[in-house]
Amino acid sequence: MSSRVELPVPVEVDAPAAQVWAYVTDWERQGEWMLGTRVRVTGGDGRGAGTTLHAVTGVGPLGVPDTMEVVEFVEPTDATPGRAAVRHTGKIIRGDGYFEVVPLGPHRCRFTFTELIDLPLGALGRLGWPLARPVLKAGFVVSLRRMADRCAAAYRAADGP
């Protein structure tokens, strides 16, 4: 087994791609929908490549630091997908993460969150991955559903179909 693993999680959202993009790439609001995560922008404007981020993932005072750099930032149009890529640069969390927003018409889109994780702890990390994967995936599914519900509710309240 390689020490790099992939974990993609898609969700369909009843809101336009541009609205979903604006919400998911508002890095400091990520804690509103991503379980156990707090993020702050540490460099750049947060709206493009070169932005640096510091996140803490955990419960209460117990958390794992996660430093990142945005290496790609392409906003969606009505017809083309948007994509943001971050490189995890921390001591524990390393790898790449991707947000992709694909328009499915004027009022709907698909958001896919993908992590390409470099497993820590060598052989122990590889042995533990089959146990950790379903837990991480379940957390991401809950988080993405929360994000989708928030975006859909905001769209309906503002000017939805």
Question: Over which residues does each language-model region extend?
Answer:
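Generic structural detector for well-ordered beta-strands
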Residues: 10-14, 56, 69, 100, ...
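Hydrophobic ligand-binding cavity/cleft-lining segments
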Residues: 1-48
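Short amphipathic alpha-helical segments
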Residues: 16-19, 139, 143
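Glycine-rich portal/gate segments that line the openings of hydrophobic small-molecule binding cavities
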Residues: 31, 41-96, 108, 142-161
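Beta-strand/loop substructures that line and gate deep hydrophobic ligand-binding cavities in soluble
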Residues: 87-142, 158-161
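Residue-level detector of alpha-helix boundaries and kinks
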Residues: 5, 15, 55, 86, ...
